[in-house]
Amino acid sequence: MEKRKIVFYLTIGMILILHLTACANRSSELPAPDSTVFGYEGETKIIFDGVCAKYNDKKEKNQVLLPIVQVLGTYEEGNITKIVSCVSLTEMSLEEGNLTIAGTNIFPMVTEIKYENEEYEVINLNSAETVLANGSASFPEVFLLICGPLEDVKQDIENRTFALPEMEKKKIREREYIEWSNVNVSTVNGDINYDEYFRLAD
C-alpha cells in the first residue's frame, strides 16, 4: 500500500513538473507585451500612453521594436498627434528598407502618421520608401517624417521646400516654410548621413 502511495505521488509530481515546464516554454514563445506588439494588418495599437500607430506589414505580425523618440500628445482615430525628437539627424540611417535611430532598428510598421493640427498632411510609409526626418530648433516639438524614393533623396533635399502649418495662432502667415539648406547627403553601405538640417525661410 505504501509503495502504491509513493508511486502515485511521484507520478503526480512528474506530471506537475512536465506541465510547468510546458507552460514555461509556451510563455517564452509568446510575443512581447501588448505595448510593443501589433496584431493583424491594419490594426491600430497603442505604443505609448495616449499614442498609437497603425500596423500594416504583411510579412511581420509579431514584435515591433519601439523607436528611440519621445512621443507626446493624445491620439484620435489611430493617429499619432505629436512626435518629439530626442536624437540628432546624424544618428539616423536607412538600410534595406529599415530605419535605424541611434542603433535601434525600427521596422517600417508605422504606415500612417497624423498630427493634431488638421493642416498637417497624413504621411504614409512603407518599406519601399525612404524615410527622411528633420527637426528644428525653432520648432522643437516637431519631428516631421518625409517620404521619397531612395534615388531621389538628394534631389528632393536640394529642390523641394517643405511646409509646416503655423505653430502659433497669433502668426499672420498661415504656414511657416522650412527650406533645406547646405545639406550634404552621402550614402555608405546603404546608410544615409545628413551633415546639416535645414533652415527656416525668411
Predicted regions and their residues:
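N-terminal export/targeting and maturation segments
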Residues: 25-89
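Mature extracytoplasmic domains of secretory-pathway proteins
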Residues: 66-132
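Bacterial N-terminal signal peptides that target proteins for export
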Residues: 2-10
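Hydrophobic helical h-region of N-terminal Sec-dependent signal peptides
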Residues: 11-17
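Short, aromatic- and cysteine-enriched interfacial helices/patches
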Residues: 24-25, 198
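Low-complexity, intrinsically disordered terminal/linker segments enriched in charged
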Residues: 123-202
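C-terminal motif of bacterial Sec signal peptides marking the signal peptidase cleavage site
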Residues: 20-22
